[in-house]
Amino acid sequence: TELVIGISPPFANPLKVAVAEAKQQGINVKLVEFSDWNTPNITLNHGDIDANYFQHQPFLDNAIKETQFKLKALDKGVTTHVGLYSKKYDSIDAIPENARTVIPNDPVNQGRALLLLQQAKLISLKDPNNHLSNLQDIVSNPKKLQFIEVEGPQTARAVDDADLVFSYPHYLRLAKTIDPNDALILDDNTNTLYSILFVVRDDYQQQHPEKAAQLEKFIKIYQTSDKVKQTLNSEIGEKLWFPGWK
């Protein structure tokens, strides 16, 4: 048997280390990379892969609401911080009026971006704690930031053109557009709401008990291996992630 896990490219290298360690324990895992954030759930729901690893709980909740897919989180992986980045300005204070500001277009990550812009005191939101706020919920925008909405993975490329960009360290590292450590501000989140999840179909453990047991072993390797941890530090950045499984 072979476990097939659908993943986002920025998560590939630490997972590959876990795959090599799992093989030594007789567990065969194949990683399939998806460049967008819709196909991994469609493919999982269809039964073409055993699990996916690319999304956090709010994103999964929203996907289930929109598609009625029968999916659930099996376990948590890494939690990454997010940041505001700029190649043109070296502080939040230096951001000018009408700055072209790039944020993700999906409701969940847009909400996360707006919370960070609020933390940076660039905007304020109707409900300051709502992690699903959208552009209509901005009650003050003193610098008249101009918002440009792009797909989440594309935020890393936008750093070259825009004035200010919300993005993810692991995507920036992959795109090589800017050093992920050079954020003007990072989110101060310490909870695991945004941990990346290992997601399976609702009935996976009942339908495939042997494979599910192997998958759980693989996840344990990912969570506990020193080599995986070293790779996460080099791939994401030591201060830019923390474990979601504690």
Briefly describe each language-model feature range.
Residues 5-30:
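Short, polar/charged alpha-helical segment
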Residues 31-42, 129-157:
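Short helix-initiation/N-cap motifs at beta->coil->alpha
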Residues 81-92, 195-212:
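A bilobed periplasmic-binding-protein/Venus flytrap-type ligand-binding module shared by bacterial periplasmic
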Residues 74-124, 229:
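A conserved helix-loop-strand patch within extracytoplasmic ligand-binding domains
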Residues 33-37, 47, 51-61, 151-152, ...:
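Beta->alpha turn/N-cap motifs
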Residues 5-9, 99-107, 186, 201:
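Short beta-strand->loop
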Residues 62-74, 87-90, 161, 166, ...:
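Ligand-binding "clamshell"
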Residues 107-133, 219-246:
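Ligand-binding clefts/hinges and TM-proximal coupling segments of bilobed small-molecule sensing domains
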